[in-house]
UniProtKB/Swiss-Prot annotation:
Subcellular location: Cell membrane
The protein's name in its UniProt record: Ammonia transport outward protein 2
Organism expressing this protein natively: Saccharomyces cerevisiae (strain ATCC 204508 / S288c) (Baker's yeast)
Biological classification of the source: Eukaryota, Fungi, Dikarya, Ascomycota, Saccharomycotina
GO MF, any single term: acetate transmembrane transporter activity
Family to which this protein belongs: Belongs to the acetate uptake transporter (AceTr) (TC 2.A.96) family.
Region called Disordered, residue ranges: 1-34
Keyword Cell membrane found: yes
Purpose of the protein: Transporter protein required for ammonia export. Involved in acetate resistance.
Biological process terms in GO annotation: ammonium transmembrane transport; monoatomic ion transport; nitrogen utilization
Length: 282
């Protein structure tokens, strides 16, 4: 597996309804209702002696030049190779996210009775924040809109979270005599991130199981922590912390999937695609 996992053979098109093996045969019909100022992709077909060429609309690609949906690259769907040749930044961003999430979630789970979360500020500002933000910008340079949006956004989340616990920003001081207002404010803050993350998880429903699980369970974690701040229930906070630890390990799993290759590891990650949902969704 290379840093940017590529499709080979027919692995990207195992569903016979999605791709016919006969040369030049159209797979999907033109959509007469989709007419925009720019040409929309309305057909996919193969060509060549061994069906080595794939046409997406009027664009021609070698089959081996297309990337499959893969959590190790934060690529949620079939995509052509990027123009810019950089290393895969997704494992770096995922690692920063995973470590910071793990530390904060252990606090939320009340591991060892810890109640003061300030130790996470360093991770949040630098590894989970700055490093993840840089990785997201790198993803944008690689033409991965989803990866760039996800990593830059969560890098910003960790920077903003760290700022809450830095006295210079004066955020906690503003709520010194109004703890209920602070709980409600943090509840709305986390609720917004839950809604955003649910939106991202919808965009991973045609990818792999671990890729989808990362974003869906993260959204549930945000939702639990939001409810905990609204209600003040420690049990809900601990539930969010336990689920956050699981999310951290899933993020590390996806990061490892993007790093491990046949040249550097004996243990390879084989992604498992989500079941076909062509008949369930639009």
């Amino acid at each position: 597996m290379s840093d940017r996992e590529q499709s080979s053979g027919n692995t990207a098109f195992e569903n016979p309804k999605a791709l016919d093996s006969s040369e030049g045969e159209f797979i999907s019909e033109n959509n007469d209702q989709s007419r925009h100022s720019q040409e929309s992709i309305c057909k996919i077909y193969t060509a060549g002696k061994n069906n080595e060429y794939i046409y997406i609309g009027r664009q021609k690609f070698l089959r081996d030049d297309l990337f499959e949906a893969f959590g190790g690259t934060l690529n949620p769907g079939l995509a052509p190779a990027p123009v810019h040749k950089f290393a895969n930044p997704a494992p770096l961003g995922l690692s920063g996210f995973a470590l910071t999430t793990f530390v904060l979630s252990m606090f939320n789970a009340r591991a060892q009775g810890i109640t003061i979360p300030n130790v996470v500020v360093g991770c949040a500002m630098f590894y989970g924040g700055l490093v993840q933000l840089i990785a997201g910008i790198w993803e944008i340079a690689l033409e991965n809109t989803f990866g760039g949006t996800a990593l830059c956004s969560f890098g910003g989340f960790w920077l903003s979270f760290g700022a809450i616990y830095i006295p210079w920003f004066g955020i906690l001081d503003a709520y010194k005599d109004k703890e209920s207002d602070l709980g409600n404010a943090l509840g709305f803050y986390l609720l917004g991130w839950a809604l955003f993350t649910f939106g991202l998880s919808v965009c991973t429903m045609k990818s792999t199981i671990m890729f989808f699980a990362l974003f869906f369970l993260l959204a549930v974690t945000f939702l639990l922590l939001s409810i905990a701040n609204f209600t003040g229930e420690v049990g809900v906070t601990r539930a969010g912390g336990v689920l956050g630890v699981i999310v951290a390990f899933i993020a590390w799993y996806n990061a490892y999937a993007g790093i491990a290759t046949r040249q550097n590891s004996y243990i390879m990650v084989h992604p498992f695609a989500l079941p076909s949902n062509d008949k369930v969704f639009f």
